[in-house]
């Protein structure tokens, strides 16, 4: 009998044993996710882990808060102690490491500062994707008002990619966004805050064609796709940002990672399982399930 721990082999998806080399090549890139837990599994770290894994990267986590929620809303939030958030980040970086840190729900200034301090200790050498989560799909606030300035001064200015939706961009810039041109102007204001790139998402505009704009110092790229008329969109922002983070961790350029991420999320929405009575989750596993 062959001992698996000794021969260091594992089964691939066709049932064949894989060598060390093949196993190493099957998963590339490490993403440390600093975000809140969604008990319903549609958003937060649950969506992040599923997304990163489905795209072939490795996901580690530092849980910032635990929420009681389902497709109908958020019913409770339990804050994780700051010292324990920091401990989660520290032990992961000391052992596993990370190519990218992706942030989600950082609900108060102290949490934002904790993540920023961890980045500084690493010499700001780890790429950073900031999803400025402010409000849950059901309307529950996930970011204290007094934390917005900390988000701008401590993380947005250090981000490789910032991924706000329209309401988040309005809060961050103090502007009103009702058109694609407004999106572009807000994106430029956000870019002036220091991130290398800003992906401003146009899903909240009432247009049949959904438009996202990626702005960076080297230029602008516009992405368009047909709007999918569905309520099963819970966790789209988390999933998109994590998909971008996975791509960057795997060595992709930001525009390439963004293009793959948008396709991944579009397909995840279009094949959503239809769970729950409210805003249902996506099908994060669609790249892995072949009929």
Regions found by a protein language model. Give the residues of each.
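Phosphate-handling active-site elements
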Residues: 55-60, 221, 247-261
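Charged C-terminal helix
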Residues: 23, 28, 79, 255-291
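Conserved N-terminal subdomain of the carbohydrate kinase-like
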Residues: 21-33, 53-138
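Short pre-catalytic strand/loop immediately N-terminal to key active-site residues, enriched for Gly-Thr
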Residues: 34-40, 221-234
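Short, small-residue alpha-helix embedded
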Residues: 51, 170-171, 230-254
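Conserved phosphate/ATP/ADP-binding segment of small-molecule kinases
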Residues: 145-220
């Amino acid at each position: 009998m062959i001992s698996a721990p000794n021969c260091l082999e594992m089964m691939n998806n066709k049932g064949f044993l894989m060598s060390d080399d093949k196993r190493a090549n099957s998963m590339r890139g490490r993403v440390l996710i600093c975000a809140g837990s969604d008990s319903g599994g549609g958003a937060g770290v649950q969506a992040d882990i599923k997304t990163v894994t489905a795209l072939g990267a490795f996901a580690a986590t530092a849980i910032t808060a635990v929420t009681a929620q389902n497709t109908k809303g958020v019913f409770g939030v339990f804050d994780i102690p700051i010292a324990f958030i920091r401990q989660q980040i520290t032990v992961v970086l000391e052992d596993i490491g990370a190519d990218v840190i992706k942030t989600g729900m950082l609900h108060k200034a102290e949490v934002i500062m904790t993540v920023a301090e961890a980045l500084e200790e690493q010499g700001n050498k780890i790429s950073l994707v900031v999803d400025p989560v402010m409000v849950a799909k059901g309307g529950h606030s996930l970011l204290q008002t007094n934390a917005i300035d900390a988000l701008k001064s401590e993380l947005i200015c250090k981000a490789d990619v910032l991924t706000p939706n329209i309401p988040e961009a309005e809060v961050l810039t103090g502007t009103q966004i009702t058109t694609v041109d407004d999106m572009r102007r807000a994106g430029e204001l956000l870019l002036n805050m220091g991130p290398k790139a800003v992906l401003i998402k146009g899903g909240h505009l009432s247009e049949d064609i959904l438009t996202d704009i990626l702005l960076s110092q080297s230029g602008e790229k516009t992405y368009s796709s047909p709007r999918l008329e569905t309520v099963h969109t819970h966790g789209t922002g988390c999933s998109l940002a994590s998909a971008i983070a996975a791509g960057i961790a795997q060595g992709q350029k930001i525009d390439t990672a963004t293009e793959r991420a948008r396709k991944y999320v579009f397909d995840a929405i279009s094949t959503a399982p239809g769970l729950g009575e409210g805003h249902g989750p996506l099908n994060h596993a669609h790249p892995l399930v072949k009929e």
